[in-house]
């Protein structure tokens, strides 16, 4: 069946991994304590944070324990029990830990997006996008193909990356944006939901990613997939999918 929709990952696909890990993540870490002093977490966010925190207290991860010892959080809190309500200071330390672990955690991604928005709007951040991206997106549109985004970063963060890119505002090239609200990127059902939202057969969608497990999940629905091997991308396990060095 003819491809009518491109579904594109961001990190390692349209933007360098280094930009995300060396610019965006450190900026969020540097500003998260200040931001959480002013930002009111929603009731749902608090609940999700506490649930995730409880999972980590029983994981025994040395980095987790060390993170809280450095911040003088009582060790008994880590080993024995978690209070019903976490202080904002503790949440900011926990989010620093999650950033370091590159955890795909909804509330963190939402708050990161808001912090990055401040950075983009102040001019402190300018996103790096691969040079071949605008032409590829424009050529697709000229051929009658719509472009969409699917990233673990929040939809707000996705808009910001393309709005404030070094190549100009690229949002004109995209129709829809999807984040983990539709599900994890390694889950088949996530791609089924995206196809359903677009009201097309999965076989009419081509998914571009740098991660084989994501490609496998998408391909299991009938989507066509392409693996991007950009500079700085991680080596992938053997797979049957086509590999592109560039668009």
Curated annotation (Swiss-Prot):
Coiled-coil residue windows: none
The EC designation for this entry is 3.1.3.77
Q: In which pathway does it act?
A: Amino-acid biosynthesis; L-methionine biosynthesis via salvage pathway; L-methionine from S-methyl-5-thio-alpha-D-ribose 1-phosphate: step 3/6; Amino-acid biosynthesis; L-methionine biosynthesis via salvage pathway; L-methionine from S-methyl-5-thio-alpha-D-ribose 1-phosphate: step 4/6
How many cofactor units bind, and how? Binds 1 Mg(2+) ion per subunit.
The protein's required cofactor(s) are namely: Mg(2+)
Keyword presence, 4Fe-4S: no
Q: Which GO terms describe its biological process?
A: L-methionine salvage from methylthioadenosine
Question: Domain of life, per the record?
Answer: Bacteria
Query: Which SUPFAM superfamilies does the record cross-reference, listed alphabetically?
Result: HAD-like
> Which molecular-function annotations from GO does this UniProt entry contain?
2,3-diketo-5-methylthiopentyl-1-phosphate enolase activity; 2-hydroxy-3-keto-5-methylthiopentenyl-1-phosphate phosphatase activity; acireductone synthase activity; magnesium ion binding
Q: Which UniProt keywords apply?
A: Amino-acid biosynthesis, Hydrolase, Magnesium, Metal-binding, Methionine biosynthesis
Q: Which residues cross the membrane?
A: none
Catalysed reaction equations from the record: 5-methylsulfanyl-2,3-dioxopentyl phosphate + H2O = 1,2-dihydroxy-5-(methylsulfanyl)pent-1-en-3-one + phosphate
Q: Identify its protein family.
A: Belongs to the HAD-like hydrolase superfamily. MasA/MtnC family.
Q: What does this protein do?
A: Bifunctional enzyme that catalyzes the enolization of 2,3-diketo-5-methylthiopentyl-1-phosphate (DK-MTP-1-P) into the intermediate 2-hydroxy-3-keto-5-methylthiopentenyl-1-phosphate (HK-MTPenyl-1-P), which is then dephosphorylated to form the acireductone 1,2-dihydroxy-3-keto-5-methylthiopentene (DHK-MTPene).
Instruction: Relate the assembly described in the record.
Output: Monomer.
Q: Which HAMAP family match?
A: Salvage_MtnC
Q: Which NCBIfam families match?
A: enolase-ppase (TIGR01691)
Q: What is this protein called?
A: Enolase-phosphatase E1
Species classification: Bacteria, Pseudomonadati, Spirochaetota, Spirochaetia, Leptospirales
